Amino acid sequence: MITNTAAYQFAPIHDPQQLADSVLERAQQRALKGSVLVAEEGINLFLAGDAEQIAGFYAWLHADARFAQMRVKYSHSAEQPFARLKVKVKPEIISFRRDDASPLQGRAPSVAPAMLRKWMQQGHDDHGRPLVLLDTRNAQEVAYGTFQGALTLPIDKFTELPEALQPHRAALADATVVSFCTGGIRCEKAALWMHAEGMDNVLQLEGGILGYFEDVGGEGYDGRCFVFDERVALDAELRPLGDGAACADAGKI
């Protein structure tokens, strides 16, 4: 059985290449595969391997004060979902190209999965404001599943979100908006940008869809959650698609 992990942390990294080299060395020593991006704004990891080796790797990474609070989301599969290990240094750990959306300058308010489930059951937040769930993922991912009634955007890349959202801004003004994505990283940047744009009614879903599945299951969610590896998509119990479905992006890192 393979242990799969997804994790990220925004933190100042003064020498991204040095960190990338250390991560590569430690991951290789433990025969892990997957994708790691390092930038001056933080680290983004998708790693898979033997459970004991995964635990050892994250114990090492958590010992670094910059990543001590980093949440790791776990799932399991019968096969290794990654073909190789790649560790890269990039300008951003998720490309958004907006100077006013830097998590190093602060963090947008968040909502825990259990609270979001409660709000969805109620149809509004605890102040009676209508609830809008904003899917910040691209159209290919949304096709596999999303939250019931979510606002989805016709985008192919995350950088297209600001323009695609413009026609909806007036309609969102009187609602509590919860941005969400796969694991939390995109919705964190999206929520920050929206706050910078004057939309102070925006929250981010803590841990993203995978965190929601892990904490409370699939209530209020239709379908599966697309992932960028050979598992293709996960159900609410974090099980891979497993039906032989293929995807052009599956397994690419």
From Swiss-Prot:
<protein>
    <recommendedName>
        <fullName>tRNA uridine(34) hydroxylase</fullName>
        <ecNumber>1.14.-.-</ecNumber>
    </recommendedName>
</protein>
<keyword id="KW-0819">tRNA processing</keyword>
<feature type="domain" description="Rhodanese">
    <location>
        <begin position="127"/>
        <end position="221"/>
    </location>
</feature>
<comment type="function">
    <text>Catalyzes oxygen-dependent 5-hydroxyuridine (ho5U) modification at position 34 in tRNAs.</text>
</comment>
<dbReference type="InterPro" id="IPR040503">
    <property type="entry name" value="TRHO_N"/>
</dbReference>
<dbReference type="Pfam" id="PF17773">
    <property type="entry name" value="UPF0176_N"/>
</dbReference>
<dbReference type="InterPro" id="IPR001763">
    <property type="entry name" value="Rhodanese-like_dom"/>
</dbReference>
<dbReference type="GO" id="GO:0006400">
    <property type="term" value="P:tRNA modification"/>
</dbReference>
<dbReference type="InterPro" id="IPR020936">
    <property type="entry name" value="TrhO"/>
</dbReference>
<keyword id="KW-0560">Oxidoreductase</keyword>
<dbReference type="Pfam" id="PF00581">
    <property type="entry name" value="Rhodanese"/>
</dbReference>
<comment type="similarity">
    <text>Belongs to the TrhO family.</text>
</comment>
<feature type="active site" description="Cysteine persulfide intermediate">
    <location>
        <position position="181"/>
    </location>
</feature>
<dbReference type="InterPro" id="IPR036873">
    <property type="entry name" value="Rhodanese-like_dom_sf"/>
</dbReference>
<dbReference type="GO" id="GO:0016705">
    <property type="term" value="F:oxidoreductase activity, acting on paired donors, with incorporation or reduction of molecular oxygen"/>
</dbReference>
